[in-house]
């Protein structure tokens, strides 16, 4: 059998058919690629939506993060401790005040002083209203089973009077120094401002910064101590 002659038109037809086949294959591949890309985009969009939903639930839900709950608990505990501390401080202050008052009352009962006498540091003091010379003041205190006050630094810090009173200090001309009424020497620094060489002089007292030499024949009020 004789083969049909190959003509240019036949070649063109074959070429067109091959070109169409290639385009069809190419379009098919492109379509598949597009479909795959679209699927990936849809999947990524789905993941993103799911992630946002999870964040909304964790951020806006009813369940608070643990650190918020912990801070609330700690804040409440701090307020409670402050309230307890305030109550304890008030109670301690009140108890201390009551104990101090009770102690003073008990000490006053244990160390009672006669009427018109003042109690201080386990001693009783009498502040006279009458004025006498120093020697007569001595005798008046002796009649009350006491003596003219022999002051110490604590008493000088405590007693601040409105006027001058006789105390148990006089100037001894023979020894040329100030002595207590029992002739003992004054402690160093006590009544240090009194001047020497004061014949027939005794000491009068008003406060720790106000005491002076006074002629023993002058009349003053006096302080007795026992």
Swiss-Prot record:
The glycosylation sites are: 145
Which UniProt key words apply to this protein?
Cell membrane, Disulfide bond, Glycoprotein, Lectin, Membrane, Receptor, Signal-anchor, Transmembrane, Transmembrane helix
Question: What tissues harbor this protein?
Answer: Expressed in natural killer (NK) cells (at protein level). Also detected in natural killer T (NKT) cells (at protein level). Has little or no expression in T cells (at protein level).
In Gene Ontology terms, what is a biological process of this protein? negative regulation of natural killer cell mediated cytotoxicity directed against tumor cell target
Gene Ontology molecular function terms on file = carbohydrate binding; identical protein binding; protein phosphatase binding; transmembrane signaling receptor activity
Residue ranges of region Disordered? Answer: 1-28
Entry's localization field: Cell membrane
Gene null: resulting phenotype: Viable and fertile, with no gross abnormalities. Development of natural killer (NK) cells appears to be normal. Cytolytic activity of activated NK cells against allogeneic target cells is significantly reduced.
* Name of one Pfam family that matches: Lectin_C
Q: Which sequence ranges are listed under topological domain Cytoplasmic?
A: 1-68
Q: How does it sit in the membrane?
A: Single-pass type II membrane protein
> Gene3D superfamilies attached here?
Mannose-Binding Protein A, subunit A
Predominant place of localization: membrane
Which residues fall in a compositionally biased region of kind Polar residues? 7-18
On subunit structure and binding partners, the annotation says: Heterodimer; with KLRI1 or KLRI2.
Function summary: Lectin-like receptor for natural killer (NK) cells. Can either inhibit or activate NK cell cytotoxic activity, depending on its binding partner. Heterodimer formation with KLRI1 mediates NK cell inhibition whereas heterodimer formation with KLRI2 mediates NK cell activation. Plays a role in allogeneic recognition by the immune system.
This chain belongs to the protein called Killer cell lectin-like receptor subfamily E member 1
- Report the source organism: Mus musculus (Mouse)
Q: What is the lineage of its organism?
A: Eukaryota, Metazoa, Chordata, Craniata, Vertebrata
């Amino acid at each position: 059998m004789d083969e049909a002659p190959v003509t240019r038109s036949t070649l063109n037809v074959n070429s067109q058919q091959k070109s169409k086949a290639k385009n069809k294959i190419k379009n098919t591949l492109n379509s598949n690629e597009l479909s795959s890309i679209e699927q990936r985009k849809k999947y990524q969009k789905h993941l993103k939506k799911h992630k946002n939903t999870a964040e909304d639930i964790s951020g806006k839900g009813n369940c608070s993060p643990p650190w918020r709950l912990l801070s609330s608990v700690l804040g409440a505990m701090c307020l409670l401790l402050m309230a307890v501390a305030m109550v304890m401080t008030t109670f301690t202050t009140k108890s201390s005040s009551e104990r101090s008052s009770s102690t003073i009352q008990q000490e006053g009962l244990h160390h009672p002083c006669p009427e018109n006498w003042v109690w201080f540091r386990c001693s009783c003091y009498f502040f006279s209203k009458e004025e006498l010379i120093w020697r007569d003041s001595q005798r008046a205190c002796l009649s009350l089973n006491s003596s003219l006050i022999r002051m110490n630094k604590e008493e000088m810090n405590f007693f601040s009077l409105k006027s001058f009173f006789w105390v148990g200090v006089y100037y001894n001309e023979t020894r040329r120094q100030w002595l207590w009424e029992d002739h003992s020497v004054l402690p160093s620094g006590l009544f240090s401002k009194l001047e020497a060489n004061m014949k027939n002089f005794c000491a009068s007292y008003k406060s720790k910064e106000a005491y002076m030499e006074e002629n023993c024949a002058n009349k003053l009020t006096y302080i007795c101590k026992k």
